[in-house]
Amino acid sequence: LIDFSRINAAAIAALPSLLARWLPDGRRVGHEWVARNPRRSDRNPGSFRVNMNTGKWADFATDECGGDPVSLAAYLAGTGQAEAARALADMLGVDA
């Protein structure tokens, strides 16, 4: 069984560095990371946002959204959440 809670907690603690890696054209605006969505031809940052306190994310231009860092990792990688959780756990040195 994958411990999504543990992986998400570790990811939230590391979110600033994860977001800088995953969305390098983004920037912090208050408690959010604002970037272009790399999954579509997004020309201007603004509609794709990640709450750095909770890990919730949304692309307000497409209504795609998720509630935690694992779902963001899955979305960005185009994989399922289980695969993304395992990869994220490995990256963070957390037992899945």
Predicted segments, located by residue:
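N-terminal structured subdomain of primase-like DNA metabolism proteins
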Residues: L1-A96
